[in-house]
C-alpha cells in the first residue's frame, strides 16, 4: 500500500464536493477535509496549490522511499477527474 495522504478542499453548497466525499466514504478513504466556509484561512493554501479558489480540490501527497514528500497530485473537480481519483484511491485501498 502506498503512503498517500489526501487533503480535500470543499464548500458545503458544492454538489461536486458532496459527491466526492460520498465516494471517499464508500471506499473508506481517510482524508483531511478543509471546509472553506469553516476555515477561510485555508483558501490561501488552495490558491497557492492551484492558482484558483475552485472546489472540490483533491490533493494527494505521497512520500518517497526516503520519507520526503513528492510533488502532490492535484485535481480540481470530482466529476471531471473521477477516473484519475479512482485510480489513486484503488492503489491505496
Predicted regions and their residues:
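Short, surface-exposed acidic/glycine-rich loop or hinge patches that mediate macromolecular interfaces
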Residues: 11-14, 36-37, 79
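Local sequence-structure signature of Cys/Sec-based thiol-disulfide redox active-site neighborhoods
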Residues: 1-29
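Non-catalytic, surface beta->alpha helical segment in thiol-disulfide oxidoreductase systems
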Residues: 62-93
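Thioredoxin-like thiol-disulfide oxidoreductase module
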Residues: 36-54, 64, 86-92
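Short acidic loop-to-beta-strand element that houses the catalytic metal-binding Asp/Glu
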Residues: 57-58
